[in-house]
Amino acid sequence: MTLAVKCPILGFEETKNMEFSTIDEVFVRLKSLDGKDFSFVLINPYLIRPDYEFDIPTYYQELLSLTPESNMKIFNIVAIAKSIEESTVNFLAPVVINLDNNTMAQVILDTVNYPDFFQADQIANYIKK
């Protein structure tokens, strides 16, 4: 599915369209469609952190035309390491997708309001051993 980027991923401001695809039951991929060959691996945060909760700021709600009835998905960017346990998740800047109009935005959360969210939180912190 092609997504229109309404608020880009930090550092990739020139990207306006991305392809969304499922890798498996845990991970998905966002791939640039604007001539640059790069992609991001994302994770459904609720699979590893069921208590993950935040309010989407009004600015982003309007940008994505979100309503309480919107078919919306939340994902977080993963920095892949040699092992999945060493890989990190950015809980401070989730990617919000509105499936009703195929738009997406990276939402930057305020660290003051979300002191337990980090940019590089190891997946190992959330895997039960």
Swiss-Prot record:
* Top-level lineage group: Bacteria
**GO CC annotations?**
cytoplasm
Q: Which Pfam families match?
A: FliW
The keyword Chaperone belongs to this UniProt entry's keyword annotation: yes
Chief place where the protein resides = cytoplasm
Localization in the cell = Cytoplasm
**Which key words tag this protein in UniProt?**
Bacterial flagellum biogenesis, Chaperone, Cytoplasm, Translation regulation
User: Which processes are annotated in GO (biological process)?
Assistant: bacterial-type flagellum assembly; regulation of translation
What is the protein's known function? Acts as an anti-CsrA protein, binds CsrA and prevents it from repressing translation of its target genes, one of which is flagellin. Binds to flagellin and participates in the assembly of the flagellum.
The protein's matches in NCBIfam families, at most eight in alphabetical order, are given as: PRK13282.1
Q: Which family does it belong to?
A: Belongs to the FliW family.
Q: Which HAMAP family match?
A: FliW (MF_01185)
Complex formation: Interacts with translational regulator CsrA and flagellin(s).
Name the record gives this protein: Flagellar assembly factor FliW
Source organism per UniProt: Campylobacter jejuni subsp. doylei (strain ATCC BAA-1458 / RM4099 / 269.97)
- State the taxonomy lineage: Bacteria, Pseudomonadati, Campylobacterota, Epsilonproteobacteria, Campylobacterales
- Name of encoding gene: fliW
